[in-house]
Every structure is written in C-alpha cells, then in structure tokens.
Amino acid sequence: NARRTLEQLHSFCRAGSPIRISGIPSFIHDLLGHLKESGPVVLPPQSYLLTGGGWKAADDKKVPREFFREEASRLLGIPPERIRDGYGMAEHSAPYLECRRHRFHVPAYNRVLVRDPVSLRVLPPGEAGMLELITPFNAMMPTLAVLSTDLGLLDPDPCPCGWRSPTFTLVGRGGLSKHKGCAITASEIVKKG
C-alpha cells in the first residue's frame, strides 16, 4: 500500500534516526514514483538505501543505475554514495556489496574469476566474461564455486574508496533467454495481488 508506506516513511523522517531502506530495485523505483507525485522527503543523516535482487520481471521498467541513484538521491534527500547495490545469488550464499564509489568488492574469503564464455579460460582484469564466484562460506554445500550467466569484469585499478579488496563490474547477462532467479518470486506475488 503506497499511501501507508509514504506515511510510515514520513513518520520515520520526523523521528530523526537514520533510516535503512532495503528492497529490490523495481519496488524502490515504484516508491520513487509515488514520491515524485507527493513530493520528496529528506531522510535523516546517515540513512542508507540498499537494493539487491535485480529487476527480474520488471525489466521493462529498468532504468540505468546512475539515473536510479540520482532520482533516489533527489527524492530521498541522501547523497548518492549512501545509495548502494548488492549482488549475489541463492546458490552462492555470499553477498557482494557496493562501496561509496559504487564498485562491488570481493570479500577477503571469496574469489571472483572472469571466464571466457566459449573456452572457459580465465580472463585477465579488464576483460569481460562470465563471472565465476568462489567461497568457502558454506562448506556443507556442493556450491563452493558457481559459474553464473552474468557478464562482468575484474577492475584492473584499485578502488578510489580506499578499500584494498579486488572489485568487479557487472556488464550484462549472458545467454539467449532470460534466467528467472529467486528474486522473481517477489515480483510475481505482487503482480498477482
């Protein structure tokens, strides 16, 4: 219910404590649409917006990430560096989060390889290919390594945020047909009402 969500958001803003908003981008995009109609809010200092899960079934509404950040910053009153995205998948059990410079950092215990889609050879930093995600995070599962259909590249230069871990950039999806991941369920539930 958009009206109740906006009322609650205004109530949180009046309370003055930092707010954490988390959700899939299409749901947040819908919220921003309501804020365009009703007027922007100013979230308290130290507030964050964290998205994750991709656009899935709402791919027809997808906007460029930079535009999304600019709109969210303007309508929520928080700086773009406090608007972050998360990347991950149910099969992998380890999240990758953007820093304030909007680069996905690889946690110390993980590895990310970029593989050529045809030969599967490991590509050097700066070359795009399929992302292979490796983690010992859940040794009880047989998915210590997952070769995704997501296309990305390891960034060749250190991140200007100051964190020293490697970073990667998503550049698209591989394959000829769209993969429906676990986040699709939330969107399907909302569409069914």
Question: Model features per residue range: what roles?
Answer:
Residues 1-193:
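Active-site glycine/GP-rich loop and adjacent strand/helix microenvironment
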